[in-house]
Amino acid sequence: MARHRIALALAVVSLLALSASAKVWYSMLWDGDSLSNTTKTKVLKHTFASPAAGARLNINVKLTAGTAVVRLTDPSGTKRYDKEFSAGRANIEETFKAPTGEWQMVVAFRNATGDYSVKLTGI
């Protein structure tokens, strides 16, 4: 009888651990599109909850004209990433440690033509 209780307790703990890790792994923000001489600014917000300890940023940009700016701000208001991309290709991956809370990403385009995708994942 005691063995069954221990096995059941271990199974419950394992399920809780998997649930918590799945919550962090699948907590993400994604945006992407094709652009044609586009000038606009997007403000994207996403909140990471505990047990996330930070975020991973993936940027893929392929522009034939214009510029794109990507800015990432963490929950404390600290600017974690700020870069302007011109015509060409860029594939960036950055990891940031920070408290949980609302992250803000600004993606601004000026006469941009091409494709882009940005992804922010809790870690």
Where on the chain are the PLM-derived regions?
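Transition segment at domain starts
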Residues: 19-49
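Short proline/glycine-enriched turn/loop motifs at strand-loop junctions of beta-rich domains
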Residues: 62-67, 111-113
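Edge beta-strands of jelly-roll/beta-sandwich modules across compartments, strongly enriched
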Residues: 109-123
